[in-house]
Amino acid sequence: MELYLISPVFFGALAIASLRGMDTLLLMTAAMIPFGMMAVISLPSVGGLSLLAANLAAAGLVFNGSLLLLTRLLRGQSVYIEPASIALGLYALYAVFSATVLVRLFAGETMVFSLARGVQGVRVSTEFAWGKVWLGPTSTNISQTFYVLLSFCFFVAATKVLQQRGAAFGERCLVVAATINLVLGTLDALGMDPLLEVIRTANYSLMNSASVSGIPRIIGGFPEAASFGGATTLFFAYFGSAYLGSGRPRDAVIAAASGGFALFSLSSTGLVALVFVSLLLLARVIIGVGASVARAALVTWTIVLTAVACAIGYLLIFTATLDVMLAIVDRLIFTKSSSSSGAERSAWALGGLEALRDSYGLGVGTGSLRSNGLIFVLLGSVGVVGTACFLAFLWLAFGGKARAADAAILTNARTAAVAVLVAM
């Protein structure tokens, strides 16, 4: 087991948060989300597995929640489980079943792109080096199943905290997370790599020198642009939606800054999600005039859009910005599929469908394969049953009605969820 310079600081903060209660642990977990490359512990004996700060903070919340649950049960008190938690629990159970039984049932019956580190396999294309291996149990089945179970338990614990503290507390957690994400993005944009090295401890490939058409990609506290772009688009979506409903300057600042950083991450998936969410918000502005959209937000949007249109017009007419923009869009969007990276990801996606076919719709096991795109990962790993459970969870978590006081926050959460799903 390896510790890092940041490890004692983290464990000290975790101990203090544990003493203060579950709400502080939830706030700390949210604060750790932007530190996507900050490992607190590394396990060389398990293939160099990095335990991230966010995961350990979530585990702390789950542990405290488990103690409270056990106390209630020992006292004979009833425990209510939300339908969304039940659906996610069924997904987690099937994930465990697939990672322990199905991966052995179909071992040697199909070839997959492995998640395991350092496994090259048999090359299937001259365009990329990643190859296929015969399906079989690996350490990634254990690690990925652990993350699924942790996510389920975290959702249950976080739900209980929000029921006690109110949905507004969840928004406060997101404010903290978004602010930290912007600070880390600013440090990365300023080239403060020596300072960021303290939190870049995970055993991941660091892509902090990547650029597109000479423009460096911003990755913040994450290992690469796609992760940073996806997370930052989430914050843009939530606070953009929040600003339309509240007109608060705070929401506008966070949304605008997050949108800018998501744009300069130059991540294909992040940009697609950013455009998609922007269109959703614009449609809400048009449809909600005089209704659900705050008047202050409408005035601000009108001023901002006019200023942006003038600025873009000036840049396109009097500078070479148009050529640079077209080159970036062409590389990230239109020629992406024909690049080696695009070919690789297309092969990963097809690999997920092949695993679904070869497992007769059951899936080859959580952590058994590398695929691309949420739906392909789900279908290949946990099959039709697991995918159905996950979709049921999404519907139950975001498709229902909230109390009048929390309706606006639910709308914001739905917008953020759309951003995450598109970015995946």
Map each language-model feature to its residues.
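Membrane-interfacial entry segments at the cytosolic side of transmembrane helices
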Residues: 79, 166-174, 247-252, 290-306
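Membrane-interfacial helix-loop-helix modules of multi-pass inner-membrane proteins that assemble, modify
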Residues: 102-134, 166-168, 179-222, 326, ...
